[in-house]
A protein has these predicted regions:
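Sequence-level preference for short, compositionally simple segments enriched
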Residues: 1-114, 122-262
Length: 262
């Protein structure tokens, strides 16, 4: 488990960097940046932004498979550059306290997450992302922050997963935002709680990413009847059909590796 971001800053519960990594039936408990799916991006945005065990190592992308896991956190609690397939996992967003929100004002140049000090996307009312006839609460968090390298075929795929929260208000959590401009995050047949923002994903206040990220969903369904309509998704989020969703089948994503047969 990693500590409260208000008192401990970034505290990674699992640093996963390598190929053919399988995590089965594990609980990863944290707040900010709970699970790092390495490798690191090629370059940091701030000088000295990467301080970690493999900061000078070659960036070699690997495949990671998470099955029947429980992962919790608040800000970007799944982040990194790996090709990672999540199946039958539960992702719980935690309510951030006032103290936790203030912790984002502290520079994170001594951490892996070199853009964590950008709070503009955290503290706004989020009305800029979806212009509708309802008011949404302040943002509580983001589930993912992928840094998929340009040209990499796959990023994060969540299949038959549950996105839940016990305490976050409706519409206060985004499914993800791009740590790097070519972030890829796809949801296939996932259950979404009312805490998920109707826009789905955020652009981290970088409109240029609308043409470079790949955010997509297929057959997402609400956990409760008070969930905002999926038709309110941001313009840069794609709604896949069945044929398109087939491109993200586990066998294709993981290639010649079949962890279920081990």
């Amino acid at each position: 488990a990693s500590g409260d971001s208000a008192t401990h800053g970034q505290a990674i519960a699992l640093y996963a960097d390598g190929d053919r990594l399988m995590i089965d039936s594990c609980r990863l408990l944290g707040h900010q940046d709970t699970l790092f799916t390495g490798p690191l991006p090629e370059k940091e945005r701030q000088p000295g932004g990467f301080i970690g065990p493999k900061q000078f190592a070659p960036r070699i992308n690997g495949r990671q498979y998470y099955k029947n896991c429980y992962i919790c956190g608040d800000i970007d609690f799944i982040f990194g550059s790996a090709t990672a397939y999540f199946e039958h996992c539960t992702l719980e967003s935690l309510l951030r306290t006032k103290a936790s929100a203030q912790s984002d004002l502290v520079s994170t140049t001594s951490t892996l997450h070199d853009s964590g000090s950008d709070t503009s996307a955290l503290c706004h009312s989020n009305s800029d992302m979806v212009q509708k006839n309802y008011t949404l609460p302040p943002i509580q968090g983001y589930v993912t922050a992928a840094s998929t390298p340009e040209g990499q075929e796959y990023g994060y795929i969540f299949s038959d997963c549950r996105f839940i929260s016990k305490d976050c208000p409706a519409g206060s959590v985004y499914l993800g935002r791009p740590w790097r401009d070519y972030a890829k995050t796809i949801l296939i047949s996932c259950e979404l709680g009312a805490h998920i923002h109707p826009a789905g994903f955020h652009d981290w206040n970088r409109e240029n990413t609308h043409d470079t990220v790949y955010y997509a969903e297929y057959a997402s369904f609400p956990a409760t009847s008070d969930y905002r309509p999926l038709s309110d998704r941001a313009d840069f989020v794609q709604n896949l059909n069945e044929q398109q969703a087939g491109y993200f089948a586990k066998e294709l994503v993981l290639g010649d590796w079949a962890p279920d047969k081990l």
